[in-house]
């Protein structure tokens, strides 16, 4: 059984196959139930893009968890390595050469054999130093798509067709990302079994309402269940036989 825990804003913790994965670890966000220095046992940190609310506290968390790997699109990985170097004293070259920081790109999955995981970066429509992306995390219990920050795009249909994510984590806040209307369209394109809204309510400008998102998805009569998680709440799943 895998467990997905919402840590506020766009941050999630995924526990699957005995591994602990963090995505977009801005744990100093005002909604987070845990502080960066409290997180232990992390195996992998996935970062979708370089904005402060996604690159987040990667330096502090990686320093606290010396066994954790950090995975991102290459230029974003380079920025993450800078943050880790500040906290640990290791050079960027040392971090890359030791495999602690891994640069990748949009395309086929990155195979992490020692963790029993695959991660595929997918297109996202957003600004970033380096390329903004989404990420599909492929585990034995199921496939989780974290869309990162993005507007709705027809590439999402390809994400659904190729990776068939069981769970989709979608921004709904508007202004910088999709709003509930666009996010509901994204669900229609991706067709996951479960959709979980994120990236709303952290700041006044992120006006998207998760209940409106749920209503608009239900109006489309899709085979998708919307689960609204409060920060600190978890969703457990096992789609290994789905």
From Swiss-Prot:
Q: Enumerate the UniProt keywords alphabetically.
A: Hydrolase
Q: Which Pfam families match?
A: Lactamase_B_2
Q: Name one GO molecular function term.
A: hydrolase activity
Claim: Hydrolase is one of the keywords in the record: yes
The record's listing under InterPro entries reads: Metallo-B-lactamas (IPR001279), RibonucZ/Hydroxyglut_hydro (IPR036866), UPF0173 (IPR022877), UPF0173_UPF0282_UlaG_hydrolase (IPR050114)
- Lineage, top-rank taxon, reads Archaea
Family of this protein = Belongs to the UPF0173 family.
What NCBIfam families does the record tag this protein with?
PRK00685.1 (NF001911)
Name assigned to this protein = UPF0173 metal-dependent hydrolase APE_1117
């Amino acid at each position: 059984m895998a467990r997905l825990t919402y840590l506020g804003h766009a941050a999630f913790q995924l526990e699957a196959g005995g591994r602990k994965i963090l995505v977009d670890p801005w744990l100093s966000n005002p909604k987070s139930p845990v502080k960066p220095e409290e997180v232990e046992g992390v195996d992998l940190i996935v970062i979708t893009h370089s904005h402060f609310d996604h690159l987040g506290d990667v330096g502090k968390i990686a320093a606290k968890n010396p066994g954790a790997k950090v995975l991102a699109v290459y230029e974003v990985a380079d920025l993450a390595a800078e943050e880790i170097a500040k906290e640990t004293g290791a050079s960027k070259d040392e971090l890359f050469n030791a495999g602690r920081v891994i640069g990748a790109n949009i395309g086929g999955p990155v195979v992490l054999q020692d963790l029993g995981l695959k991660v595929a970066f997918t297109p996202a429509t957003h600004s970033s130093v380096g390329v903004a992306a989404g990420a599909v995390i492929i585990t034995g219990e199921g496939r989780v798509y974290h869309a990162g920050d993005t507007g709705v795009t027809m590439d999402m249909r390809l994400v659904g067709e190729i990776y068939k994510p069981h769970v989709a984590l979608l921004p709904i806040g508007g202004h910088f990302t999709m709003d509930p209307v666009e996010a509901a369209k994204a669900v229609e394109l991706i067709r996951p079994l479960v959709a979980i809204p994120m990236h709303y309510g952290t700041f006044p400008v992120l006006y998207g309402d998760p209940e409106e998102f749920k209503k608009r998805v239900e109006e489309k009569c899709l085979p998708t269940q919307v689960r609204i998680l409060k920060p600190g709440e978890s969703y457990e799943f096992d789609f290994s036989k789905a």
